[in-house]
């Protein structure tokens, strides 16, 4: 079942509005201190299921696109971000080979079924330039068990292995897989000082203690 735009508005507001400022600060650190290794300032980037724009507002890129169905998203996006207000598994309004990177955070598990996941992977690959990357961050059900279903709009259960396999089936080349990266959610977690967030990112051994989200970096083949 796909959530309607009105339902998404209610879900986002209930779940994220209270921590919006904190989330923005965390993503400033994540984008500049970690994800910038794959996304250069001259890149054209699309944020898939962008939410309130925490990633796309903070990443340094020449051209920024965002895609989401939530009708509230425009009020949260920076002025340099162009929004596609649509179902991410429907055809994208972009030409082939136009994107350097597609990023998604906690998105694929919200799609209604695995066929929608496949359609989205195909559209991302079509729009990526040869050598362009799909960077996917998401909850790893392997390490979550029942907590995965605490969010009403989680429909598709994924691990780093299953989503990585889906990417390979669609023709991507896996460059990096991190089974445990970030903690599960900021929704119910304490708001830690930013110095601790920076420390966590800098010490990968902490990921294996606290991380319950996977990170996958996959590339569109160059030939």
Predicted ranges, named:
Residues 118-130:
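A short glycine-rich, Lys/Arg-flanked "PGG" loop and its adjoining helix->strand segment in the class I
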Residues 131-138:
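Conserved beta-strand signature within the Rossmann-like core of class I S-adenosyl-L-methionine
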Residues 139-144, 180-183:
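Short "lid" loop at the C-terminus of a central beta-strand within the Rossmann-like core
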Residues 165, 176-223:
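A C-terminal cap/extension of S-adenosyl-L-methionine-dependent methyltransferases
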């Amino acid at each position: 079942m796909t959530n309607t735009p009105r339902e998404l508005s209610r879900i986002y507001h209930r779940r994220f509005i209270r921590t919006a400022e904190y989330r923005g600060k965390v993503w400033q650190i994540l984008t500049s201190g970690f994800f910038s290794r794959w996304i250069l300032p001259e890149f054209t980037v699309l944020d898939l299921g962008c939410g309130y724009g925490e990633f796309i507002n903070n990443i340094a890129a020449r051209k920024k696109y965002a895609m989401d169905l939530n009708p509230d998203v425009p009020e949260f996006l920076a002025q340099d971000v162009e929004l596609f207000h649509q179902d991410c598994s429907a055809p994208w309004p972009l030409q082939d080979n136009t994107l350097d990177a597609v990023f998604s955070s906690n998105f694929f598990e919200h799609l209604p079924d695995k066929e929608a996941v496949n359609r989205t992977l195909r559209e991302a690959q079509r729009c990526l330039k040869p050598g362009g990357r799909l960077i996917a961050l998401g909850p790893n059900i392997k390490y979550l068990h029942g907590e995965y279903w605490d969010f009403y709009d989680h429909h598709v259960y994924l691990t780093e292995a299953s989503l990585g396999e889906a990417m390979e089936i669609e023709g991507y080349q896996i460059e990096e897989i991190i089974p445990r990266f970030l903690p599960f959610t900021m929704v119910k977690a304490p708001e830690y000082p930013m110095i601790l967030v920076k420390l966590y990112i800098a010490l990968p051994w902490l990921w294996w203690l606290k991380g319950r989200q996977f990170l996958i970096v996959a590339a569109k083949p160059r030939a």
